[in-house]
Amino acid sequence: MAELEFEKPVVELRNKIRELKDYTKNSQMDFSEEIRILEDKLENLEEDIYGNLKVWDRVQIARHAERPTTLDYIEHLFTDFFECHGDRLFGDDAAIVGGIAKYKGMPVTVIGHQRGKDTKENIRRNFGMPHPEGYRKALRLMKQAEKFNRPIICFIDTKGAYPGKAAEERGQSEAIARNLFEMAGLTVPVICIVIGEGGSGGALGLGVGDYIHMLENSTYSVITPEGAAAILWKDAGKAKEAAEAMKITAADLKELGVIDEIIPEAKGGAHRNLSKQSENIDLMIRKTFEQLNGISKDELIEKRYEKYMKIGQVSFSNASIGIK
């Protein structure tokens, strides 16, 4: 498993423990006490490192090459998944996957950004950066879900929508804007979960819902830290400073009222334990459906509208702006 820079002390200690255990198996010497001491030290070290993650550490975890993807969670959370392809206008975009599935026996529509697990798949899926046809495919599935009264679950995991010439020619901004408009008025429940990076309009194109949740080490921002640093300071190398200033973590966004709940992750990140992470997401989905149960279509849309009207509100007292 690939290690991140801040994890090196933990990885080195784990390797020492493993080597000592292997040596003990092949010798007559007993190192059980030494192993116990090292394991206690490892537990304390993990608590110290993973319990005090900096913003940039979380950015690295969110981008981890082995972080679970939409299809991983679909496999663990749903049954009878049937993937649907194409936007019926131009083509199919592998950077967004979606289809019909069952959640605890209930028909649902599941949609999400999809990154690759290796170079070949990343190229096929454009590194999880959708073209307009991806967003139009997603909208087609959402409108189908509305027609057949199926709840929608969206998994968000993208650096952003693809900014290439072909995407712009085919109406990238219109496709995203159309999704924002249409999702705001859907008459079925919509649950959105940020599972990795939630980057810019590319994330928002699947991000208008009744409840917005984030995994503990995911990020959600208007631009990547590197992009913000390049614009503000003409130096992408200041990405760490930008990340700190941008308030992009789940804890920051929960405090700001942008998201509803934070889904806990395994120590070190979701990639450490996919089964446990899927259980944590499952608990949150069940809880959210319970909260949405019994709400009429009109009330659903009204509450969704009120939710988004509250985001970003700023109030000033006369004293704070110098008015007597």
UniProtKB/Swiss-Prot annotation:
Keyword Transmembrane: no
PANTHER family: ACETYL-COENZYME A CARBOXYLASE CARBOXYL TRANSFERASE SUBUNIT ALPHA, ACETYL-COENZYME A CARBOXYLASE CARBOXYL TRANSFERASE SUBUNIT ALPHA, CHLOROPLASTIC
Presence of the UniProt keyword Transferase in the record: yes
Top-rank lineage group of the source organism: Bacteria
Gene Ontology annotations of biological process type: fatty acid biosynthetic process; malonyl-CoA biosynthetic process
Its biological purpose: Component of the acetyl coenzyme A carboxylase (ACC) complex. First, biotin carboxylase catalyzes the carboxylation of biotin on its carrier protein (BCCP) and then the CO(2) group is transferred by the carboxyltransferase to acetyl-CoA to form malonyl-CoA.
Subcellular location: Cytoplasm
GO cellular component terms, semicolon-separated: acetyl-CoA carboxylase complex
Organism encoding this protein: Bacillus cereus (strain G9842)
Higher taxonomy: Bacteria, Bacillati, Bacillota, Bacilli, Bacillales
Domain CoA carboxyltransferase C-terminal span(s) in chain numbering: 37-291
Broad class of where this protein is predominantly found: cytoplasm
Top enzyme category: transferase
Recorded family membership: Belongs to the AccA family.
Keywords per UniProt: ATP-binding, Cytoplasm, Fatty acid biosynthesis, Fatty acid metabolism, Lipid biosynthesis, Lipid metabolism, Nucleotide-binding, Transferase
Pathways involved: Lipid metabolism; malonyl-CoA biosynthesis; malonyl-CoA from acetyl-CoA: step 1/1
Name the UniProt record assigns to this protein: Acetyl-coenzyme A carboxylase carboxyl transferase subunit alpha
